[in-house]
Amino acid sequence: MKKFLALILALVMALSLVACGNNATPPETTDPDTPDVQPENPTTEAITNADDVADEMTSEDGKYEIAFVTDVGQLKDKSFNQGTFDGVKLYAANNGLSYKYYQPANGDQATDDDRYDAMKAAAEGGAKVIVAAGFMQATALTKAAAEFTDVKFVFVDRDSAVTTEDGTALKNVLGICFQEEQCGYLAGYAVVKEGYTKLGFTGGGGGDNPACCRYGYGFVQGASAAAAEMGVKVEMNYSWLYGASFSASTELQTMASGWYENGTEVIFACGGNMFQSVAAAAAANDGAVVGVDVDQSSQSETVITSAMKGLSASVQWACGKVYDGSFDEIGGTFVTLGAKDNAVGLPTATWSLTKWTVDDYNAMLAKMADGSLVVDNDYSKLDSTDSLTLNLVK
């Protein structure tokens, strides 16, 4: 990305990270230089902590300009939904704009019609921009964007342009996706360098969620690379069971407990509220957890690191494009953000690793950013390696 996007991502992620399309870098024509966003009604001092902004507010006219349509799971999931909504709240609060969140009916069993109804309610409720989280929004968002052409849509975790049936790109939609394989790699590399060799991965979406698949494949690659360097063998349980709805469950906690009881030392909990089940199992079995999407160390003492992506920062940038009048330059496309944009990484403000240091981490992150370390994102190649034995749990 260019200067402004890199700047806003750096500013937001600096709170937890040390600063150091179909391609990884969007085409120049879809990613022009961007001026600073000029807020309509700026506050005297920028708010940087989303927890300082209420989840709900009441607008004077009953209209809400910036809307957020949640993914499955809870709004305050301390992960994907919350990280995305944080961006909505911060942009709105810092620019004097009204905002509201909409949760599709039927919770984890929400249908495409439920998601569309939430977007329709947002559009009819005055939304100028609708931020939708999660790849499962695709069908509903395509329908809503085609109907409400004056509304801008920001589709988080979308790795291609949104098109109509005839292949025409919807110009009022921007897709944002991340190179989760990079932060997954960093997490896998870190835990093996820390001395762990019995690992686990449990992912959401039943194996159909591209972001979770990239996280998991990166985790395997990083662990394998560290093991090869150290001359050790790593074993990893790898499962999509009990994660289709990204929810906590007794079944998931039981499975994770069984892994820990049988020698697993660290589990990467990759799927919203699934974290709660894995963290509970870890706490009961003296195990460790890798968090996902945001820094989850405050949620459990079992967390040793988290594979993070810049959800809040990217949403703020995209909203800024709507309000500075330049959204049309990127509408109908998607952007892919990674290390080069300071958009993925591990949290250093809460660093607890002792054998692999922040300096080590920054050096590896810099290699990813300059392209000298390339992490594969083709998760169809997931398999065991000479240094890592993969146990696919079905």
Where are these regions (language model features)?
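A residue-level marker of the well-folded mature domains of exported/periplasmic proteins
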Residues: 22, 31-394
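Positively charged n-region of N-terminal signal peptides that target proteins for export
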Residues: 1-9
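C-terminal motif of bacterial Sec signal peptides marking the signal peptidase cleavage site
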Residues: 16-19
